[in-house]
């Protein structure tokens, strides 16, 4: 199951990238991923909090950074890094900043889900996560 969203942002690719990899600042602008512990380096283990509903934050443990490329402006992480849990449901979350013009980018934000429960959870997750990712995209654009 894949969830994929896009938004055009009137900013340079470099500026959008700087916001994405500034994990300590997520709580000040991101309404969905409200906190990230760790650094944006390949192989680094991160954990983060997501806002599941008003007043409800869910901790997501032990995701591994797979790609963190300033050159291609791509950030990906996969989790959870718990072997039994990843057989049931695992997601590869991604952000890609595509330069369209000097001060205009396409921000691609999505997640590929795999595991035994991925298909069964699609009706529950598809619309909710698409809405959440679009909410984050709009907040990034406003930043």
Language-model features: locations:
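Hydrophobic/aromatic beta-strand elements that line small-molecule binding cavities or substrate pockets
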Residues: 5-7, 61-68, 91-99
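Beta-strand/loop substructures that line and gate deep hydrophobic ligand-binding cavities in soluble
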Residues: 81-135, 140
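Hydrophobic ligand-binding cavity/cleft-lining segments
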Residues: 1-41
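Glycine-rich portal/gate segments that line the openings of hydrophobic small-molecule binding cavities
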Residues: 37-86, 138-143
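Short solvent-exposed loop/turn micro-motifs enriched in small/polar/acidic residues
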Residues: 29-31, 58-59, 88-90
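Short strand-connecting beta-turns/loops that link adjacent beta-strands
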Residues: 12, 41, 70-72, 100-103
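Solvent-exposed residues in well-ordered beta-strands and their adjoining turns
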Residues: 8-12, 49-51, 98-100, 110-114, ...
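Intrinsic-disorder/low-complexity, polar/charged segments enriched in Ser/Thr/Lys/Arg/Asp/Glu/Gln
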Residues: 2-6, 45, 74, 92, ...
